[in-house]
Amino acid sequence: MSETKRYRAAVFDMDGTILDTITDLTVSLNEACRLTGHRADFTKDDVRHFFGSGAEVAAQRALAVEKGYSLREVGTLGVTKSAAAFGITDEAANAVIAAFAAYYGEHCDDATGPYPGILALLKQLK
């Protein structure tokens, strides 16, 4: 006889797993960069590469790409290399981070919503 396993809980990461946040992250990071005088034309694909280690590292990665580093190279920033290794000053990074936090705080749910099928999945797990 086959025994069915029953779980009492399921744990998910919200950002990028349950919720599709990439549009709001992209708009917010570009606006933060624009407000602080930096390159502000990053695509959703670029921004997907920037995030994963928090907003601070994402801002630093954007500044490194602005300096000419590849997405592959900046993937090491915040993991095995510091922002200083890419010539990113604390002053520049902190300005972008502050502008991002302020803008994203006001616009974090402009386009964010659950990925298709997520609500049905959660109801099924209930």
Could you say what each language-model-derived stretch is?
Residues 1-3:
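Eukaryotic N-terminal low-complexity, Ser/Thr- and Lys/Arg-rich leader segments
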Residues 5-14, 18-119:
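N-terminal helical cap/lid subdomain that shapes the substrate entry/recognition surface
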Residues 118-126:
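Catalytic-core regions built around general acid/base machinery
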